[in-house]
């Protein structure tokens, strides 16, 4: 984005802030109480009181004008502000002319000005002021007809011509009337401009809704108005004005405790309307986004923005603040009560920010521990941030317990802080395990089990804390004050933080238990089998001192195969289904005998030949699995699909065809004593026990 685009974006926000401030002022202004005060006072004869109903209607007209100013396009909004500046300049010229005429009346001198130094000074000052006003007006209105704005110079010209003072007063009034007529002419000539703008805007909105829909229209207006930045700037202006007002009326220095109270009170003062509350929500969102961005920058440097240029974070904290403010009725409270409640809500927001920081830091710290990066600065940044996330939530929970009375919301804050500290502790423990494994020459076999136990312990504690929060919330709902919003929060908390976590943990436990049972059911290889196999583990590519043998005759480390079985229940090489002892017993009881084997058993060869024996021995050594099975691949179909394909073959190959096929091959081998290549293309089916089919 260039400098021009940045300037236009800043102007787009700055020009719309006054419309939000006008809406805020109109919301604060109670018209009914204002006129009641006038009625009780001696001003009930005031013309404003006589037209109070017109004033009430103008109050609503002010809302409409504010919305119009808020939604105007930037070019038209800039023109409107320029016209407003020109009107202010004309008013300044009128004031300069009126002050000059008044000072001349008070002096009573009507002679030549060069003979009276004070009169000459007054004339020069008024002349310079009028020239500046005329020049600025011509620049603002972008016209070279400077005489249009020089009507207020007529009293100066009259004084220069030695016209009497009484006549100069009349000339000044004429100049004022002439300027007013110019303004009225300008307004009349542009009277249809708002109507034309509204007509064109309605036409464009109708086209957008017809083509893209209401949602696209809302998103387009949201982006064009830059609503989050607009409300944030509006709230910051309010907050700065509140702080300035306080310090401008105080002469004594403020203590540290007083500054904290001033900070909370000023925030509470800036949350008395829905518009200021929205401003605080977006401000908190941007503050959270800035903190999380700094956190990621501290951990990864500029690489964080290269990998993740758009961080859509921070809205969670803002929405949390908005929900809590609406649920507790923050706007309707008094300033002191609002400041107290706002401090609790801000504690909840800070706890949410800390949890988001941990979500950013956790994968980065674990990846750094598992990698071979030996940069001490990177490790220091990761560990220091984890230590901060370990200590600060605990300190915050301690301070809450010290200064506040315990209730449901404070229990949620404390539980969130404790869980954050526990999760950081688990992350540091896993990081230490990774670093220990890094400095060891041989890998630690049970490091994954230790990591699982650490994470499982944290998840169990997290589940128990969530369960305690739900129990406390239910007890407060039953025996205390019942609210719909509180019940909804308890229900949502119970579903997401209790029920779903319990389901996920139980499913993980069942998968690990099933994997352990499968590993125990597999036979352990002997040293002779390992020497005969003479291969490495196909999962970790390390030498095997001990291994288990799958039903498809593949060798793996027990720990490596167990990790694989945590994810899926197939062989890593051939993707055959690996079943436990109970599953194998059920499968064997339901299996049928292969018809080719039965036929060979009923009709054995009567005259075994040496060539036939050699041939059968050679065929017996042919591996049942192809060479593609020597590396794990995910492109091979699992065993279920192989069984389905075998079923398709059984549909096309009948029992008699298979028997005649095998008999013809055996007779040809017995008569010729040789095996032809076409003899290997037999349509007989393999036995069911041979799960590893050819690929």
UniProtKB/Swiss-Prot annotation:
Gene Ontology biological process terms, A to Z: ERAD pathway; proteasome-mediated ubiquitin-dependent protein catabolic process
SMART domains per UniProt: RING, RINGv
Stretches the record annotates as Disordered: 589-608
Cellular localisation: Membrane
A Gene Ontology term for the protein's cellular component: membrane
Membrane topology: Multi-pass membrane protein
GO MF annotation list: ubiquitin protein ligase activity; zinc ion binding
Keyword Zinc-finger: yes
Main location: membrane
Zinc finger (RING-type): 537-575
Regions crossing the membrane: 53-73, 77-97, 123-143, 146-166, 168-188, 225-245, 275-295, 316-336, 340-360, 384-404, 410-430, 460-480, 482-502
SUPFAM superfamilies (alphabetical): RING/U-box
Biased composition (Polar residues): 589-604
Keywords of the record: Membrane, Metal-binding, Transmembrane, Transmembrane helix, Zinc, Zinc-finger
Name this protein carries in UniProt: RING finger protein 145
Organism annotation: Xenopus laevis (African clawed frog)
Gene: rnf145
